[in-house]
């Protein structure tokens, strides 16, 4: 196969991936951009849950009592956050919701200064929950995550073929950075944005495939249910005893012991302290909270603990496919019109 034939083959693959899957790629990528800063968006959508208030003036157990009275009977406390705005308590409902996506979580928000109840509801806004479910499974029951994984393969292939097609056919490779490689704005946007976002988009696609790989291979069809841990309804240590053993200062997030891990997890800054619920033994993770909490490929994909620069790149990596999809389709339609005009002119000339 000659270089021209190979380039044309890559072009056809790149073109038809973009045309056929644009309507799926665009919302999938945009929801990914939303999830990079899901906490910030949740604050915008539910401002009352994050309203500024005074410093914590009560003991953690007092906040816990307020939350228990506000939650439905039979709810199981999972976590508490103290020190950043209102105190937030997260719990699982008495019965599974039966809804698709991650298990439903209830939230209770408490004024830290007075201990008064601010509000109750889902732990995150319905919009953000929808974004999580759509990005992870396209709202498709069962096989949705596998479908998203194969879309990641297509996106990775599109990124690689796009980079190949960006490379100038003649002359120095630096010609590829020229803004006016083409006579139309959409084509110039497509080539310039496509080059700069190709590597981040490829990383996003590859890590997305890794996350979905078990489901793509037909195993572990419900990973959230398999990995779900049940918080202990009754613990040996009280909340106050666990925090006293941890000896932490400032904002903290406390996670309750579970049936699989019988330890209190107390996150303070970049430090994770574990307190054994049976004997109060304390251990400290010296390598940081984030690295223990999530694998590196997941943090590459969602930006957790990766710094502002990478989060901005990920955000743009979610916006770019929308621009590339629209400009690519415009370029394709223009080419179709041009070919139709050429064919009509040839037919007119032949008829004379």
Regions inferred by a protein language model and the residue ranges of each:
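Conserved histidines in hydrophobic membrane contexts and catalytic metal-binding motifs
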Residues: 1-352
């Amino acid at each position: 196969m000659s270089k021209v034939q190979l380039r044309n083959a890559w072009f056809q693959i790149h073109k038809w991936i973009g045309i056929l899957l644009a309507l799926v790629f665009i919302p999938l990528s945009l929801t990914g951009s939303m999830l990079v800063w899901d906490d910030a968006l949740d604050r915008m959508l539910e401002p009352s849950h994050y309203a500024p208030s005074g410093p914590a003036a009560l003991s953690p157990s007092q906040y816990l009592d307020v939350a228990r009275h506000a939650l439905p009977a039979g709810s199981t406390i999972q976590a508490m956050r103290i020190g950043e705005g209102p105190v937030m308590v997260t719990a699982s409902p008495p019965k599974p919701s039966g809804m698709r996506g991650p298990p439903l979580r209830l939230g209770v928000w408490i004024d830290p200064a007075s201990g008064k109840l601010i509000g109750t509801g889902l732990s995150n806004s319905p919009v953000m929950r929808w974004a999580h479910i759509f990005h992870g499974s396209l709202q498709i029951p069962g096989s949705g995550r596998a479908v998203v994984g194969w879309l990641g393969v297509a996106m990775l292939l599109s990124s690689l073929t796009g980079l190949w097609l960006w490379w100038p056919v003649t002359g120095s490779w630096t010609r590829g950075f020229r803004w006016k490689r083409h006579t139309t704005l959409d084509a110039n946007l497509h080539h310039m944005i496509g080059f700069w976002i190709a590597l981040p988009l490829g990383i996003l696609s590859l890590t997305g495939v890794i996350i979905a790989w078990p489901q793509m291979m037909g195993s572990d069809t419900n990973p959230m249910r398999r990995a779900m841990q049940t918080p202990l309804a009754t613990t040996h240590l009280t909340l106050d005893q666990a925090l006293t053993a941890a000896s932490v200062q400032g904002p903290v997030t406390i996670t309750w012991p579970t049936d699989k891990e019988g330890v209190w997890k107390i996150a303070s800054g970049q430090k994770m302290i574990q307190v054994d619920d049976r004997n109060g033994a304390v251990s400290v993770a010296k390598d940081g909270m984030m690295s223990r909490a999530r694998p590196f490929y997941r943090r590459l994909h969602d930006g957790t603990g990766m710094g502002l620069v990478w989060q901005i790149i990920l955000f743009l990596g979610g916006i770019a496919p929308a621009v590339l999809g629209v400009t690519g389709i415009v370029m394709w339609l223009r080419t179709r019109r041009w070919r139709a005009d050429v064919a009509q002119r040839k037919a007119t000339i032949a008829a004379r």
